[in-house]
Amino acid sequence: MLLTTGHARARPEQQQASADEPLEAKPEDGHSLTAPRPADDELATVAPTTTPVPAVAITQGATTGAATEATHSQPVVTAVPATSSTSTSTTVPAPLLPAAPEQPEYLKHCFYADEHLCMYGHDGQGNEAPDVLGHISTTPESDSQGIGLQVNASQGNSQNLERNANSCQCHEHPAKANSWYCCNISQMSMISSCSNISKWTNLHVRNLTVRTIDLSNPIFRSLQSLAVTDGNITRLINAFPRHSALKCLNISNNNISEIPSRMFKDVPHLEFFGMSRNNLSLVPHHNQNKNITVDISGNMRMLCNPLNEIINNDSFNFVNPKHSYCLYNATHEWFQSTDLVSVEQLESTKRCMTKCPVIPNYGSCKCRFESIMIIQDDQSKPKCHVDCSNLGLVELPPRLPDNTFVLNITNNKITSLGDHFQTNPTYHNINRLVADNNQISSIYEFEGTKFIENFQRIYMRNNSLSKIPEYFLNNALMDTGRRIYLAGNKLQCDCNSAKTLQNWLKERSTDIPDYMEIRCRNIPQSVIELQEAKLCQSPPDWTDYIYYLIAAEVILLLGLITKVSYDYWVFKTSGYLPWPASKMPKLPCDWLCES
């Protein structure tokens, strides 16, 4: 089968062959041919599969056997039988190819040869090599010669391999000037032996089996686009020649695990670097000011920490960052793990620096990317650390970067937390608050906030706290692993402190490492040393004696009634009063008893 792209000419052997003579379908370069081989006098023109090229129709006359070319606006397939007695041509319109997608700006200087160009044989000058086996009759009479031909072909192949190693195995692209492609290269001499290499502008090498490539090779000096893909390269060494004109470099789909860190030292014009589907763990540094687009997808050994340094460099842009991953060493609460994190997630860490708070009249906070919080369903978040310490602030910053997990406001003059933890969305993700050495007098502002539900660390040492709210005692340490630091605060101690706060500190001593250093402001001792018996004594309460007084009065009243009744009975029965009653002065009411 003979397939050409863009243009083709009939070979003399094709013009003389019989149209009815069957030909053997011969696999070439490891590719199987499943379709039957057409007659030699038929020539098919196939449009390229990637980049559309003007199609060429071939017309063939029986008398002269000459081939003429005609360019059409649409791809066509032309087949002309040799048995025609007059010059005829038949044109069958091929289905319209879909419009090629618009090429990204960063690929405008890149050259790639279609894969099908490597599927057919060529001689050392870029012409198609004669198909020897294709012209051997497969009739029964020729079967006896098959074994001998196979032996000769095997010997010829070994000789060809030896000859090809020292001859040019590259071919000029049929549609793009000064652009060459090389296929199935096992030695660099197959490229360096080509003529006029210094005039090459673009080069695409497919299936290069050389393990190590020296980038300082003069072959690459004049190139603007270099693609070495679909091979078995494992290592690149040295750097490109000085003042290289290279604008596009693609080494995708190899086994490369090592790249020189200074390979771009003398490549000032590079715009695209494709290194996808390799075994790389690092991206080489790019010290030029020019922007460069890189594709690192498919490198499953890529490390996040060095990659994050490159991401912070504004001159790097990434292709498909959502599906380009790197290995991140994550530290969880109880263990460490290695997780896959997308470049898109790493790029979001840049916002931690760009949105760092600047406080008028006080100065700028310092922000840095701390780590990545791994969440399921590819929703991992970068942790931003905001340091606003030692600025003399009197209130909290009005806004923080997104995904701020750590806020450090140590050594300021802040007196109140305000309503930031309740109403400010940029405070909702904080799980570590470092607020030592301030003048904060209350933590009631934490009540009902997301912070009190999610925090892991609170540092409130050396502040002006006077009381620990009851809600804080009940809810702050419900989850294990949380830590609260309150040393240096002088609380107002009373009986309730001795009963409730002291017990809370004893029960949560592991969660409050400095509980021994929490002191009282009204008693010269620490809270943990309070004695309930002393603090909970109450002054005498005279209301307890009222009941005794009432009881005594009732008893006296009953005794008086009894005495009067007795005296009356004695007087009625004996006619005289008892001695105590007779000595008592008479009262105006005594006449009632005498009547």
Swiss-Prot record:
InterPro entries: Leu-rich_rpt (IPR001611), LRR_dom_sf (IPR032675), SLRP (IPR050333). Residues 489-538 form the LRRCT domain. Residues 347-402 form the LRRNT domain. Glycans are attached at N250, N255. Residues 1-42, 64-98 are annotated as: Disordered. SUPFAM superfamilies: L domain-like. Gene3D superfamilies: Ribonuclease Inhibitor. LRR repeats lie at residues 403-424, 429-450, 454-475. Pfam families: LRR_8 (PF13855). Disulfide bonds: none annotated. GO terms for biological process: intracellular signal transduction; pupariation; response to ecdysone. Keywords: Glycoprotein, Leucine-rich repeat, Repeat. Has a role in the ecdysone induced cascade; probably indirect control of 'late' ecdysone genes. This is Protein halfway. It comes from Drosophila pseudoobscura pseudoobscura (Fruit fly). The gene is hfw.
